[in-house]
């Protein structure tokens, strides 16, 4: 019937929009993960492209369909949904990054590229945190998501301390320069 066809077209259109937005966020996550871990000296490409990307793509299909079925409004509600989707993923990435940095002996002698990539990761974390705080109801009780945000912020502070230690190690090893002092 015509109504069924229109429902199918609506569902498919909304599903494509959600899937593309989730895929773009996943692409940022994969790109930052690959850049950070390669700068630390850990080859995560087999895990990322062998497991993370295929499982993420398959999961995004299901999540996008669930969002459409839940009648989420694409314009008004997508940002809080994406924040709740990517906060756990970025928290896991930060925790794995801390473990990799601790295991790698050469982390304190990291290059500028690594420090710049860490800055990008911290900007994304700040964006996730600020948006979720601004969209949160002040009267709502603290739940699992707020606790997860605390873990994410704590992890980001540890990463920030590691970056600061690496910057100080670079200054100690190579001396002061205008770029090092400015950063």
Language-model region placement:
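Alpha-helical transmembrane segments of polytopic membrane proteins
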Residues: 46-59, 112-123, 179-183
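Membrane-interface helix-loop-helix junctions at boundaries between adjacent transmembrane segments
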Residues: 1-56, 66-83
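Membrane-helix boundary/juxtamembrane motif in polytopic membrane proteins
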Residues: 5-17, 78-84, 140-155, 173-183
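Long, well-ordered mid-to-C-terminal structural blocks that present hydrophobic/aromatic surfaces
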Residues: 76-156
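Hydrophobic alpha-helical transmembrane segments in multi-pass integral membrane proteins
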Residues: 24-32, 93-102, 157-170
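Alpha-helical transmembrane segments in multipass membrane proteins, preferentially the mid-helix core
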Residues: 62-69, 124-139, 156-170
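Juxtamembrane "helix-exit" motif on the non-cytosolic side of transmembrane helices
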Residues: 33-41, 98-107, 134-135, 166-175
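Phenylalanine-focused residue identity feature
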Residues: 8-11, 37, 49, 63, ...
């Amino acid at each position: 019937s015509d109504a069924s066809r229109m429902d199918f077209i609506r569902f498919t259109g909304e599903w494509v929009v959600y899937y593309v937005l989730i895929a773009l966020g996943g692409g940022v996550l994969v790109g930052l993960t690959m850049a950070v871990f390669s700068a630390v000296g850990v080859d995560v490409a087999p895990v990322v492209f062998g497991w993370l990307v295929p499982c993420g793509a398959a999961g995004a299909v299901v999540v996008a369909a669930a969002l459409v079925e839940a009648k989420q409004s694409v314009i008004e509600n997508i940002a809080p949904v994406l924040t709740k989707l990517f906060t756990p993923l970025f928290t896991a990435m930060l925790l794995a990054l801390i473990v990799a940095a601790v295991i790698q002996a050469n982390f304190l002698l990291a290059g500028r590229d690594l420090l710049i990539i860490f800055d990008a990761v911290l900007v994304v974390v700040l964006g996730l945190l600020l948006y979720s705080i601004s969209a949160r109801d002040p009267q709502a009780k603290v739940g699992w998501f707020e606790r997860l945000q605390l873990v994410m912020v704590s992890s980001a502070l540890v990463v920030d301390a590691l970056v600061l230690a690496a910057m100080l190690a670079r200054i100690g090893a190579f001396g002061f320069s205008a770029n090092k002092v400015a950063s």
